[in-house]
């Protein structure tokens, strides 16, 4: 959950490609597995992101996802799912391209509150970074976060 009691400050973290390429494969907790986006998962992304306070309404979250990510979601979005294939955590990678600048980013890492504390955030973030560097070898990856996500900062170190 976001801790909005703190003043908001933007934080940019960078992982060099050599470090990202050496990350060990993620190991989700027993009863969970990681899978890529499949059509219809935009509603799960919206539910998960709203559950952690990133959006106030699922409809707004879904509209954002559809506008920004949907055309390439299968390449960029991963989920941690339960044994019943219910998504409970997500992470998205994105390549920002502006003029001749290209920057790989990890975005929207979230775990539903009922499933937090089981290492799922670390597992999904690691899986997303590993997948991104396979698709864009040699590129560093940025993570934009904020002080409201201070609990997650340990995860990103």
Q: PLM ranges: what are they?
A:
Residues 127, 131, 154-155:
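Structural preference for long, well-ordered alpha-helical segments within the folded cores
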Residues 118, 122, 147-157:
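Conserved active-site alpha-helix within GNAT-family acetyltransferase domains
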Residues 33-45:
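A short beta-loop-alpha structural element at the N-terminal edge
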Residues 50-111:
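A conserved beta-strand-loop-helix scaffold within acyl/acetyltransferase catalytic domains
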Residues 132-145:
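Conserved GNAT acetyl-CoA-binding A-motif
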Residues 107-117, 145-146:
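A short, internal acetyl-CoA/4′-phosphopantetheine-binding micro-motif in the GNAT/acyltransferase core
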Residues 106, 117-125, 132:
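Glycine-rich acyl-CoA binding loop
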Residues 1-30, 38:
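Acyl-donor-binding surface of acyltransferase catalytic domains
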